[in-house]
């Protein structure tokens, strides 16, 4: 199984390690490639868009000509996982934390693949980084979620979206067909269950 991690910014090495562990968990050999250019996305079975700064990642994805091949992969039902900033990149709509509930356009490149509205930095400056055990549908035991200046979903825009996890007033993990997004960083734990759940979509 060949999995590409978009490697323009973010926790690429951490995703590589946890993907390999997830592969072992489900009995699959996982080859991880770092995707910086379109040719790196050829013949991949799944894609991960990691955390980082969503505006920067989006602009770098455009500069490296990754947007079109990513959209083509999505159209062909290739599984895509977005974590933290990756959730923002996958969202159809994004609003700033300062104005939740308002239709403020964010000037940043988005793939717009998931029918959700995401609030950037949803938990505010006072809770920029924290860890909490949450329940995730599809996983038997609670999962240690690491939030770092995390976004969150404040509105689901389609019945096609399945809510997998909530924390406080927000939705923090969603699934739509072959797409999966989390507000937290599952790659910053040693628990491969969420990545294994993702790989089982291949």
Swiss-Prot record:
One of its GO terms (biological process) is pyridoxal phosphate biosynthetic process. It holds the Pfam family SNO. One of its GO terms (molecular function) is glutaminase activity. It comes from the Archaea. The keyword Nucleotide-binding does not apply. It catalyses: aldehydo-D-ribose 5-phosphate + D-glyceraldehyde 3-phosphate + L-glutamine = pyridoxal 5'-phosphate + L-glutamate + phosphate + 3 H2O + H(+); L-glutamine + H2O = L-glutamate + NH4(+). Keywords: Glutamine amidotransferase, Hydrolase, Lyase, Pyridoxal phosphate. The active site is at residues 84, 185, 187. Belongs to the glutaminase PdxT/SNO family. In the presence of PdxS, forms a dodecamer of heterodimers. Only shows activity in the heterodimer. This is Pyridoxal 5'-phosphate synthase subunit PdxT. The lineage of its organism: Archaea, Methanobacteriati, Methanobacteriota, Methanomada group, Methanopyri.
